[in-house]
């Protein structure tokens, strides 16, 4: 997969290219990340990339020419079929369904804004889609771009150590992940659930699904509103709710 980065701070992406899952993907040749800085496409001795906005107001905007030329250079390197994405608070909010959708593209170019943003005409002429990672303000598009890269890279075959990992991630099926445990078996009086030690794979699968449904109901109930639960899922969720109510009643009685 090819991902081009257009950013005033390309060195920030070493966190992606040099470390962790994405770093290994780059080393294996599964992920090709290249970057272009608009400063390299300026024509003045100060390497100016920003200017005042028409109509006044605070802050500066990224200028058209250096940014557009950097995008064109990234497009030329990517070849035909590259999708150009601008990381923006006005964009579609990134979720697991969106990540899965973006992962079907073999070529992405991510444009990272700075200052107060970019000239609207760049968005109109060069950008295919705008994406946001949430309803809050950041200093630039680099961190959202890294978030997008990390999440999308997990779908590239061979990137994860276990092919089921991406399938079983939180949100992969619209639910939060279940609790996980490793050694020791007992930690300060807290025991690993016995079912996980049983070796009964059918019961383990059932327990994990129940916990996933229950955790989603407790922490992100709005996610369940968009799901058509299977008969098994509905039954397991009902069991979880009953067990949770019993635990709450027991806890209240001890308080």
Swiss-Prot record:
<dbReference type="InterPro" id="IPR029026">
    <property type="entry name" value="tRNA_m1G_MTases_N"/>
</dbReference>
<dbReference type="GO" id="GO:0002939">
    <property type="term" value="P:tRNA N1-guanine methylation"/>
</dbReference>
<dbReference type="GO" id="GO:0052906">
    <property type="term" value="F:tRNA (guanine(37)-N1)-methyltransferase activity"/>
</dbReference>
<feature type="binding site">
    <location>
        <position position="113"/>
    </location>
    <ligand>
        <name>S-adenosyl-L-methionine</name>
    </ligand>
</feature>
<comment type="function">
    <text>Specifically methylates guanosine-37 in various tRNAs.</text>
</comment>
<dbReference type="InterPro" id="IPR002649">
    <property type="entry name" value="tRNA_m1G_MeTrfase_TrmD"/>
</dbReference>
<keyword id="KW-0819">tRNA processing</keyword>
<comment type="subunit">
    <text>Homodimer.</text>
</comment>
<protein>
    <recommendedName>
        <fullName>tRNA (guanine-N(1)-)-methyltransferase</fullName>
        <ecNumber>2.1.1.228</ecNumber>
    </recommendedName>
</protein>
<keyword id="KW-0489">Methyltransferase</keyword>
<feature type="binding site">
    <location>
        <begin position="133"/>
        <end position="138"/>
    </location>
    <ligand>
        <name>S-adenosyl-L-methionine</name>
    </ligand>
</feature>
<dbReference type="GO" id="GO:0005829">
    <property type="term" value="C:cytosol"/>
</dbReference>
<dbReference type="Pfam" id="PF01746">
    <property type="entry name" value="tRNA_m1G_MT"/>
</dbReference>
<comment type="similarity">
    <text>Belongs to the RNA methyltransferase TrmD family.</text>
</comment>
<keyword id="KW-0949">S-adenosyl-L-methionine</keyword>
<keyword id="KW-0963">Cytoplasm</keyword>
<keyword id="KW-0808">Transferase</keyword>
<dbReference type="InterPro" id="IPR023148">
    <property type="entry name" value="tRNA_m1G_MeTrfase_C_sf"/>
</dbReference>
<dbReference type="InterPro" id="IPR029028">
    <property type="entry name" value="Alpha/beta_knot_MTases"/>
</dbReference>
<dbReference type="InterPro" id="IPR016009">
    <property type="entry name" value="tRNA_MeTrfase_TRMD/TRM10"/>
</dbReference>
